[in-house]
């Protein structure tokens, strides 16, 4: 699997290693992005644009990892629900419900998804989403055409 397929295609399967590599790159990118935005070195519109640009590769990597676990990519919508709950304003609810709906439930969803996708082995052999896990080729083959 090429890097382009890894980051932009929703077809195929990837293993835990390639999933964790993307998570590490994503966190590093977020750290840089929010550090620059926090020090006013980057305007909020540019930071938001960069964040939106990272959504597609994150979704593609997540869906391929779900496929490796034998699940539909629709399970990725749980993560969207969790982010929406985290971003919501729950001030109209009583105190404990603000915490439960606004913090506990989304955090629980995200942690469970991260453990499921990052810790458990995918299905062995071919499944309905493709052949066995494909490794990402991070280096191009440097074969000369002589």
UniProtKB/Swiss-Prot annotation:
InterPro entries: DUF805 (IPR008523). GO terms for cellular component: plasma membrane. Pfam families: DUF805. PANTHER family: INNER MEMBRANE PROTEIN, INNER MEMBRANE PROTEIN-RELATED-RELATED. This is Uncharacterized protein YiiR. It comes from Escherichia coli (strain K12). The lineage of its organism: Bacteria, Pseudomonadati, Pseudomonadota, Gammaproteobacteria, Enterobacterales. The gene is yiiR.
